[in-house]
Amino acid sequence: VFHYRGNVTPPKNPSDWALLVTQLAEHWVERYGIKEVSQWPIEVWNEPNLSMFWKGDQAAYLALYEATWQALKAVSPRFHVGGPATAQNAWLPEFDAFCRARHCAPDFLSTHYYPTDAFGEIGADTATQLQHAPPGVMRKRAAEARKIAGDRPLYYTEWNITSSPRDALHDGAFCAALAVKLTMSVDDLVDAWSWWVFSDIFEEDGMPSQPFHGGFGLMNLHGVPKPVFRGFELLQRLGTGRWQVEGSHDTVTCWAGDGEWQGKGRDGSAARPMPSAILWVNVAMPHHAIASESVRLSIPHQGDHRVKAAHATRIDETHANPRAAWQALGSPVYLSPAGVERLQVASQLVDEVHSVVADDAQTWVELVLPPQSLALVRLEWS
């Protein structure tokens, strides 16, 4: 769309469009089998509420959706079809009402949202947009969408901390900390949460050459994982089970998860799961107050089990920060293979032994969180 000038106009002949969709769907079924393709969530179009992606109006999009839905379902009712894939949570009530009236109910609801959308002044720099983004805006928008989706899956198929392809905020620990906090804020509302985008290679906006230029990828041009990539890695290590954590702070948030629990009872039998991973973030929007914070968490003993050791993994200015390693090389525009390898090493997560203190009832875990950082502490139980 940006460089290749893709056609974003409504179909001139709806019948021709339906035939195209039908033949494409039949090809998928023939090549991959209905068992496979029925697992593919198929969105109809992308951000039709933005003129750069769709030259028609809302009515034209809804007609396109209906024609596409009918064509796909005619090939197989097992196809999963949804939308409206709009930017900024737009058109969700209208889309839902139309689908109900026309009996073309989506199998899932999808939309996009960025925290910078909330400020509403597109021309403002992203730091200012984030500064003025209302607290909890991503959860608020997800809750609105969840109400409309009902029991159907809700997919946010595009998000990031900003929508800019050139923003230095994307390359540092702030991005990782904010991404983790936003992800956890909607964990109970959203079924899929898709980061835009995997790589900084985004030639449609002009092919970049500088290894760190503020691209919105999880990895830089050379495939070096950026801090946000590692942030999602720590989220995976947190596990899917949750334990309640009591306490609050303006910039620090904490979650307890089951991690990779491998505990056994004293008789060798499998013991009940316990919190084995603690994830902290210390993050504030640009131009808001933030400082290093000393945090302390007490973990009660669980019957015969108690925390016997801990390891901490950090993401901050001195941990998992390949941009700092690049700057230490003199910020070269073009990297040698050896330079790329140095950045790969600098991007790695490092587990460090972390001391704990215990009494007869509980174990205490303490650490200092620098501004705009996150840390995961893995607990080992006896």
What residue ranges belong to the model's regions?
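Acidic, Ser/Thr/Pro-rich beta/coil linker or hinge segments at domain junctions
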Residues: 302-360, 364
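Noncatalytic carbohydrate-binding groove/subsite architecture in carbohydrate-active enzymes
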Residues: 21-24, 58-193, 211
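Aromatic/acidic polysaccharide-binding cleft in carbohydrate-active enzymes
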Residues: 156-266, 270-290
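Active-site flanking residues adjacent to catalytic metal/cofactor-binding acidic residues
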Residues: 42, 46, 157
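Substrate-binding cleft of extracellular glycoside hydrolase catalytic domains
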Residues: 1-31, 37-39, 156
